[in-house]
Amino acid sequence: MLQINSRLAVIDGWLVDTVKRKPINFRSPEVRLLLPNDDDYKKLSQQNLVDWTRLKKDSNSVLVGVKSMELFKHIKLVLREFFLLEDGRIILKRIRSKLRYKVVKKLTCKCCRLNLPKWGTVYIHPMLKDKEKPLAGVCEFSLDVNPDREYPLIEINVSHQYIIIEGFLLYLNERRLYRWNDNNLRSQVGLTKWAHLRKTYNPVSLDILYSLNSNFYFVKDDLLFQLLGKRVFVKFCKVMENGKCGKAPLWYRVKRTTTAKATHIAYAISNSTAPDSFKSKNNDYRFIVREKPIVENTISNLDYSDIKKQQFTEAEVVKRKISADISQIENVHTQFNSQKEKNNIRVNKVSSEVLDQISKFPVSRVTLLLISAGQDKNYIELVEELARRLEKICIEKTTQSLEEIRDTFQANPEMQARFDKEYYQSIEEYKITLELIKEDLLITLIKQMENMWAAEKKFSTEEEYVSPRFLVADGFLIDLAEEKPINPKDPRLLTLLKDHQRAMIDQMNLVKWNDFKKYQDPIPLKAKTLFKFCKQIKKKFLRGADFKLHTLPTEANLKYEPERMTVSCSCVPILLDDQTVQYLYDDSIIPEFEATSSYATKQSKCGGKMSLQMEPDLLFQEAIRRMRHLTAYDVLRRNYIAAFEELYMGNCND
């Protein structure tokens, strides 16, 4: 370090204001003001100083590494967040909305901001040389999400999605943490399943945090902070318990701070014990703290082992108390709970790779499926918008029909009050059923629509008549007289076709019928002409998770197959030379369910309009039957498909 005067010094080619602790550009006019002495200015001009303009020219990123540990000991550093893009650039986090490139990594480091005339802003940070130890207070970090880790995904009545991360219950519909010992949650899940899930996963971390005297709780898994979104910067402070001095025991608490002084990142939640202070400037917060620090602050005299010991000791005591309290609640409610629980609970596994790609909330089951399938953000947003429009159409249509039934009792307030109990319950039930239908059908409908487009594009021109009776289309030889595909090697063609016609067939790349013997399941085809001219039969199959059809299992194994997967599909049978039959089906047609979903409402057989001349009790029963019919799974499913076709045709006409 070369001292120019009492204020300025040159450190490894950098001119530094040692009073304000910042680098100064040698070309800046303020340099001459700080060096009124000509000898000092001449001394400075003889130094080999860093050209700031080269920083921007030599780098396509705003974050530039500098190999000078001595420099960073004499300048102020602030904590900033950056994005590493797929094109290799590093940019400041706040301008992400202007980007077209995918964010590969999120990182944070302590750095110093430099303003370059005509070139904008860059941030310099210490770039370590070999065998150098990190500078005190400087450490890069990024949220490190393990893509192979799996988490419990709890689905309640199809439409409510929860995941558990290190004992914290996160509600994906609202991006909100829930206490497990919550009356509304217990009512939503049902007591029996609530108790079972608690014993299996014990998601009581938020309950523990609210019960601690400490205002923090350490978490190792970065995915929780990734999903919770907005984070705050914090540091640990020593305090005396109960605010006393002298012999009072030492205590650690977390305090929000500036990025320059922060040691950890955290997620802040309001203290539920003081809800009235939520809007107060001095409201009390508790913090879920990322265990890994963002800086190694050697200047601080805090011992992190003591901090972790404080939390562990206190949390173990609180955990036992909470477990005992919840067990008591379970025992008391079980004795007096005689009602049958109707809620449908499903527990699956979801990978952190899928959860890490969630871009916005709320999150539905369909969204998770699309992410798992590798669909991009724009495609998922289009599907979500389509789902919202379909749901709106179905709800408006069903609600209008239910309102017409409800209006029947306007003249009888007592009967209307009695009917309203069933009415509002039906509204809740059919909305749940719509969520199930969306999960069952939406992806299939979109897939069939895409297949239809592909089929029309691929096969619209591939037709050639060999004779008035035989047509070649979609890779098949079609017998128009018998309305069926025929084997190109069929001996009958020797008498039905002339030599030049058979030669024409031999030169065409037609499907080889022996290849059909390799398949046990029906074969999906995008063959518009084939299905147009060939006779089709109705056949029952099973629809798999891959949306393809499979042959029905044997009678011995039939009970293991989900009833809701059985579908009825039109197909073209092909008799092979070994007398076995193979089936071809149109992949662009939506198969009809033979049986409703296991969660579906049973369809009523009633129909038609109600007669106002009925006795009040009979009229009430008829209204209930009509309402059950309109909210049945099969009826809502037909409405959903009709709404999809309406939107599809509307877009086509546009």
UniProtKB/Swiss-Prot annotation:
An example Gene Ontology CC term for this record: nucleus
InterPro entries listed in its UniProt record: ORC1-binding_dom, Sir1_ORC-binding
Nucleotidyltransferase as UniProt keyword: no
Sufficient for interaction with SIR4, as annotated region: 322-654
Function per UniProt: Involved in the establishment, but not the maintenance, of heterochromatic silencing at the cryptic mating-type loci HMR and HML. Is recruited by interacting with the ORC1 subunit of the origin recognition complex (ORC), which binds to HML-I or HMR-E silencers, DNA elements that direct the formation of silent chromatin at the mating-type loci. Establishes transcriptional silencing by recruiting the three other SIR proteins, SIR2, SIR3, and SIR4, that function directly in silenced chromatin and establish repression. Also found in centromeric chromatin.
Subunit structure: Interacts (via OIR domain) with ORC1 (via BAH domain). Interacts with SIR4. Interacts with CAC1.
Predominant location category: nucleus
Residues covered by region (ORC interacting region (OIR)): 449-587
Name of protein: Regulatory protein SIR1
A Pfam family annotated for this UniProt entry: Sir1
Keywords: Centromere, Chromosome, Nucleus, Repressor, Transcription, Transcription regulation
Protein localization: Nucleus; Chromosome, Centromere
